[in-house]
């Protein structure tokens, strides 16, 4: 029997009432995975034996009635370090690496009774927006297996949308949770920078990376954020701002709330059908009592250029640690130390990772630092100031998550620029360190369209409040791809 259509609250009730054991639920989840995974390719590793052991241990101690996640399965993006379980960031250069420690979020999952059932596919080192940059295999979209699932958290979104797992963790550097969530018709949140510990997240761009939750509904997403948030002394960028109950405002009236609609988010390059769905969603929020007004974020048009200079520069520095010596892939038939470095990195990194390392190295070079990297930092400040100005008057910002619905697999592989522009609407949120969510808001040609809600720093509660109000009065989140019911 499959339980993939039940919320974690409903599953928890079954567990507490002993209508099902954690072991039985885990076996049912493994069965859901084996039925759907061959068509989706969301997983890099399924940790069946450990998951069953963990479930049996939970049954032996008894389900905690006060912890809604106790005994529930979750899958984790493969750039989140898991002790004793191979972690590769979908890269050949980390093939076979078994971490000797857990990421802070991995510890938090097990402390809250969540059972990690596997590691999820992704774009290599989280660099990509389609899921096609994995060195292992491309993940497929849950709604149409000829389409991309989005990236870089491709497996995180597709595994949830296809009914394999109820919850997953991803990471978001320029849209890598929100964009695949939009393409697969689920809920994905990038928390405020510093809200969730990055200790044990394989670094891409350290001033932008953030771990976040993916789930079928707003409430489940908030319940998972409750688990993973909080200060961590192991992460120097972790914030000790108090962690609220992120579900506390769900169900509240949104009457009188002020929502900003940036005109730049509806301009050139935005698909007409996507625009139509998002403007209809804005009208719907007005019917619920919100005040929606047009605003301007004038510097957002520079976001993509700024991001690719800053992110690539940080990646160029972060990825120097993969050298073929300490761990991971090591080239054979080498002549000397320099040859070892060159061959290991050339053979171990995929083309997109190499492209970004080169771009970052160039941006940091003596002749380019002031002209590119320093200037990008200055424009980043202007983008931050734009948001701050809007938030003086408004509670939230609303727009599309992506300019288009999911495109065909292979369509943009040889066109990195068009791939980069797909993150046009999500990137500014990372540059400003703000929280942002994508929720299902309609369909275009049978493919999901995501609406993005952007909030003030550390105000994920308000995002969830408005997202839940929209979800409760629409049916988009109830629609499921064919594969879900198989």
UniProtKB/Swiss-Prot annotation:
Give the catalysed reaction(s), semicolon-separated. Answer: L-glutamyl-tRNA(Gln) + L-glutamine + ATP + H2O = L-glutaminyl-tRNA(Gln) + L-glutamate + ADP + phosphate + H(+)
User: Its gene?
Assistant: gatA
What's the family?
Belongs to the amidase family. GatA subfamily.
Q: Which UniProt keywords apply?
A: ATP-binding, Ligase, Nucleotide-binding, Protein biosynthesis
Q: What is its EC number?
A: 6.3.5.7
Active site as annotated: 77, 152, 176
Q: Which domain of life is it from?
A: Bacteria
The record, for PROSITE patterns, names: AMIDASES
Name any one GO molecular function: glutaminyl-tRNA synthase (glutamine-hydrolyzing) activity
UniProt xrefs under InterPro entries: Amidase (IPR000120), Amidase_CS (IPR020556), Amidase_dom (IPR023631), AS_sf (IPR036928), GatA (IPR004412)
Name the segments for region: Disordered: 130-158
Q: Where is the composition biased (Polar residues)?
A: 132-144
**Gene Ontology annotations of biological process type:** translation
Stated role: Allows the formation of correctly charged Gln-tRNA(Gln) through the transamidation of misacylated Glu-tRNA(Gln) in organisms which lack glutaminyl-tRNA synthetase. The reaction takes place in the presence of glutamine and ATP through an activated gamma-phospho-Glu-tRNA(Gln).
What is its quaternary makeup? Heterotrimer of A, B and C subunits.
* Species per Swiss-Prot/TrEMBL record: Lactococcus lactis subsp. lactis (strain IL1403)
EC class: ligase
Q: What is this protein called?
A: Glutamyl-tRNA(Gln) amidotransferase subunit A
Any GO CC annotation of this UniProt entry:
glutamyl-tRNA(Gln) amidotransferase complex
**One Pfam family linked to the record:** Amidase
